[in-house]
Amino acid sequence: MAGQELDAQAVHQRRARVDPGWHPARGLSRLAESARGHRAGPALRPGGLAGRHRPRRGCVRGEAIATLRVLRWLPGADERWQDYAVEAGADTTVLDALVEIQRGQDPGLAFRYACRVGMCGSCGVVVNGRERWACRTPLSTLGPGRITVRPLYHFPVLRDLVVDMAPFTARMRAVGAAFTPGDGERRDARISGDSAERQEIDEAIECIGCGLCVSACTIVAHNARFPGPAALNRAFTLQRDSRDTARSTRWGVLLSDDALARCHGQANCTDVCPMGLAPTRSIIRLRQMATARIFKWGPRYGPRLF
């Protein structure tokens, strides 16, 4: 299981079994909302921060019983599903339940988390077939029946729900995701807050690298060279920044056969982003910028984009 890439069709079939309402293009409606100027901030999304700033110390007797089916895997062993029954209140999150399982039932259950309040993004998992932050997903919002929890797709699994984020970081490096300042005399940067440049950057800058969008992307499923939505979203913020001096070099990566040209625009990344970002829109803007560049400098500056 570790390190293996999933075929796109297998991913679709697997998700459809877990979440009958899932569709490869489910994010298009979310992208349309974003295009109309609606942006759901973290506090407005289901399972927001209210009421979950404290660690959960235990369940109150008499609370409802929820069943979590967790995908377990250890190196050298076969993956298996294991059921756990936990007491759950109205504000109990998936992360609360996992912590209770680890403390009281199965100390060997492995998962990753840090802040517990929706700030770090380290607790990303797939719950009932959809990518979510465990700390921001109340069990009460998941409906009746058994709740499935598995690791993110398209990442090597280290153990149980813990995935290796190294490929995510490598994709970021591949597109030159670091800001590159100019040499010579240092000058104060002046980018007006009401400029189109600043506004477009601000709409895409809040990515915290949780990896949910990469897990939801169907192109990453069968093309290991595709940078993925998070890396392309980051590239957009840099290509739009007039202070960055690596934009020409970065275009060489973005206009390769396996980057912008490969996105199918299904907007799954936009649909699952907990920060309310729209990576699909950033990719569309990069294509528009690339098209203008090609018209200006000639077709040798880029391949077929669409």
Where are these regions (language model features)?
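Short, contiguous acidic and Ser/Thr-rich linear segments
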Residues: 82-92
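Glycine-rich phosphate/adenylate-binding loop and adjacent beta-alpha elements
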Residues: 127-149
